[in-house]
Amino acid sequence: MKKKIIITGGLGYIGTELCKLYSGVSWHHNITVIDNRFISERVNQIRNWNMDFIQGDILNKDLVNKYIKDADIVHHLAGVTDVPRTKNESSTIQDEKIKEVGEKGTQNILDVISDKCKIIFPSTHVVYEGISEVKTDIKEDEDTKPVLSYSSSKAVNENQLKKSGKNYIILRLGSVYGYSSDSMRIDIMPNLFSKIASQNGTLKLFAGGRQIKSLVPLIDVARCCLLYTSDAADEDDSVD
């Protein structure tokens, strides 16, 4: 049976890879990509894959109501990705934008989707960034302790989903890395290290290189997002 599938933030790092995976089945479903940017090469490719593209913002309630209201599946990937990594990098304007897009945008979607719609939301491992003890195996029921605006907004999003009564899946992702033919996040550690090494540069490690970093390949994240669209997948769940 044809399903109506929405991908918000579909021109982004994860969204681009997810669209590629959907390209093999896009003639069997009604797939719409929503993004507030217009990147002509990616938009043309999406349309060639028989997907619709809508340039718009999830803060626009009328747009959300028009295109998302009767969705069967929503991959909610939209959000601000240019975020501060330390308190010194933070600014009030940037923090407010992260909060507005993340929290108001998510609520706009939750307000219009049906209880039968499955919403798949990528959260982040940095919701644990305030934990002082170094842990290598954090369980899903561990209390979150966000510090910066990005992780704080994601923690709020998780609570929005849990209280919504909707059919949701939360994926607490590690730092997503890897090459995509359409996009490349050079600000991500493994990608940056690969670039430096390919140019015979020097990698500088501080604190003796003892830091622990959670990493997950881009393609695995996209596959996971697709996997959880299955009717057999767990519902109302958080997965680390």
Language model segments and positions:
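NAD(P)H-binding glycine-rich loop region in Rossmannoid oxidoreductase-like domains
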Residues: 58-100
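Active-site helix of classical SDR
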Residues: 153
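Single conserved hydrophobic/aromatic residue that forms the stacking wall/gate
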Residues: 228-240
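Conserved Rossmann-fold NAD(P)-dependent oxidoreductase catalytic core, especially the SDR/UDP-sugar
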Residues: 107-147
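NAD(P)-dependent short-chain dehydrogenase/reductase
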Residues: 159-213, 218-222
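N-terminal Rossmann NAD(P)H-binding glycine-rich loop of SDR-like oxidoreductase domains
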Residues: 7-23
